[in-house]
Design a protein with these regions (language model features):
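Conserved pre-catalytic core of RNA-dependent polymerases
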Residues: 1-8, 13-175, 179-182
Length: 182
């Protein structure tokens, strides 16, 4: 930690997304080349400055309520995200990071029942996002092209479109075959 800032990152610095993307690409390529490869030493990549800054940027853009500690994104912005990220980095590096309990809220459902909702602290969301940034490319390498659930740049609408197109092809092939036989 340097001057209350994330190591190597001035508080006003632009997010070095290119460095994070390079890391992700490298992890993806390694995972794709060998399905049996075991990855070691990923933990130190989670607390890299560029990864934490990108995780913060994504958490900030998602917004959301404060967790059990009542610390909001706005309060962190006022205090300075550099100091906030430096604290996270130091805790992760020293092995002292422990996630906080999740704040539980209930939201009403259309049928009158309630659905439980867990709200993690902003701090925990940043660590979760940093972990996702590092591990996602490794898992992505193993997913099938036909898999759409909870994947980057894929949606339920795209899955439905693939099903619709495949269904049309099957229907046309069946119709053509049926006509040819009669």
């Amino acid at each position: 930690m340097i001057g209350g800032k994330c190591e190597g990152m001035p508080e006003t610095a632009k997010i070095p997304i290119d460095k994070v993307r390079q890391l992700q690409r490298k992890l993806y390529v390694c995972a794709k080349q060998s399905r049996t490869r075991r990855f070691h030493a990923l933990y130190d990549r989670i607390y890299r400055s560029d990864v934490l800054w990108e995780a913060w940027r994504r958490v900030r853009s998602n917004g959301g309520a404060a967790g059990i500690d009542a610390e909001t994104i706005q309060a962190i912005e006022q205090r300075g995200p550099g100091e906030f990220l430096a604290e996270i980095q130091a805790a992760l590096r020293a092995g002292r990071y422990r996630p906080s309990p999740v704040k539980r809220r209930y939201i009403p459902k259309a049928d009158g029942k309630q659905r439980p909702l867990g709200i993690p602290t902003v701090r925990d969301r940043v660590v979760q996002m940093a972990t996702k940034l590092v591990t996602e490319p490794i898992f992505e390498a193993d997913f099938q092209p036909c898999s759409y659930g909870f994947r980057p740049k894929r949606s339920a609408q795209q899955a439905l479109e693939v099903i619709r197109v495949a269904g049309n092809r099957t229907f046309k092939a069946t119709s053509t075959t049926s006509r040819g036989k009669t």
